[in-house]
Amino acid sequence: MLFEIVCSDYTQTLGGIRDVDLVLTSPPYMNARTYDIGCTFDFLDYQKLGDAIYQVLKPGGTCIMVLDAPVRNWREGKGSERGLMPWRVMLDWADRIGFRVPDRLAYGRLGLPGVYSGRFRNDWEPCFWFEKPGAKAYFDKTCMDTPSGRHNTPKLITSRRPDGTVGKRVSSGRAVTEGVKRQGTHLWYGNVGANHDLPELYMSGHPARFCSKFAADMIQCFCPPEGLVVDPFVGSGTTALMAIKHGRRFFGGDIQQQWVDRASNICKAWLDSILYPF
């Protein structure tokens, strides 16, 4: 299986697989969009999703999940607030389910122009990094390294120690020997609008895509070559396309047949362009 996309909800999609290397996904946000099918999530749904993901991951497997919440009147008498659901989900998955949370990440994207009275424009979304204990997780961020254009000469650099004192050392490693400028940080920026992403993904018309560069980085960083990537909310097929483009297998599902068809067609078209280039 190079890729397979089925029409099913997340419980069915995740119910028949095991030994997954990476789940890369963005589930519906609570009280945000309905996707024309009355689909919204509450805390119980997120709990069920976490349980299902934990079951399908192999020991040492990783889940990267982009999850935010809109501004609403969530609490009586408090006025409008940014929803706290993402952080409740993170704590629930860590404390109740048992996921390891190595760090916190951020998915940056330009918010819609506007005045935003009383708050700032939202240009990022929480990106949660979960690991299933039991084995060493795959992690290789060299895929995000870029050449600096020159070989750096060793030089004296300083850094602050935990006790507050400043230490000194001579720079070394790939930054010096190969002229590598490392790009991997906690923050990924990516736009999904016209002329900012792959045209086949932009033209899909999905209302809640994430950037293909973000998906490509996550897949190469957290899933070994020929490993299995899963997205139970496949949408336009960004995760699927980036998985097969970068030598990983993919399995995913969506509750709407139109997105299953579009994502499958996008992946098939890319494979055909490789197998039959003329």
Where do the language-model regions lie?
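Core catalytic lobe of class I
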Residues: 1-262, 268
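Conserved phosphoryl-transfer catalytic core
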Residues: 265-278
